[in-house]
Amino acid sequence: MIALCACVLLSSGCQLAGGMAEAYRRNSTRPIDAEYEGLAGKTFAVVASADRAIQSEHPQLVEETMRRASKVLSNSANVPKASGFVDADEVIRYTYRVPSWPARDALTIAEDLGGVQRLIHIEILEYRLNEPGNTYEWAGIAAGTVSVYEIDGNDPNTPAFTTTFNVDFPDAKGFGPDQLPRSGVTTALLLRMIDRSTWPMFRHEEPYYPEY
């Protein structure tokens, strides 16, 4: 009988400890190492692109992507840490001055931007806030690719690292303009896109159970 009680107490204790650990995970983050460490000690520039349909619907998207991604990747606390970068506004001016830049190879673009050692291209392939034809409910999606070119490497015009991103917002159905303003949905979706497009390049914290 004593042995049986001890087993029951032990089992209850294990269940309690397991429940506490699970509760901790649900409200905590864990460190994730960089997938790509090639920014260490290098200079970089971020360019972003999207097709005309996306840019027509979201005129500031490409510029905001370059600004926000550059800010995240230039953080002095990043590990690995870049040695320098081209300011996003300078890159934006370049894209206006040379509208045909997407047709140029990575080496040429990098040289045009002052000879940076890493060129990061964020290509936005899909970006929408609603299902087509449904303006009453938010169903935001942002998807695309990230390519990093090592300009000082042996093959500067072939990506040394590539990754994809695919995020959505809101996390549940049933939210429309009456519940969430368009500006809030746009900002949340953009921030998620920036996280997923930049996180692979530095050590960062992610929730144990990420929402995106």
Feature-to-residue mapping (PLM):
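N-terminal segment of the mature soluble domain
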Residues: 40-125, 159-161, 188-201, 205
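Bacterial N-terminal signal peptides
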Residues: 2-12
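C-terminal/domain-edge helix-coil "capping" segments
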Residues: 14-41, 113, 138-141, 147-212
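Residue-level signal for secondary-structure boundary sites
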Residues: 54, 130, 152-154
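Extracytoplasmic/secreted cell-surface and envelope-processing proteins
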Residues: 129-135
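Generic secondary-structure microfeatures
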Residues: 1, 120-128, 144, 148-152
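Short, glycine/charged-enriched secondary-structure capping and boundary segments
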Residues: 60-61, 135-138
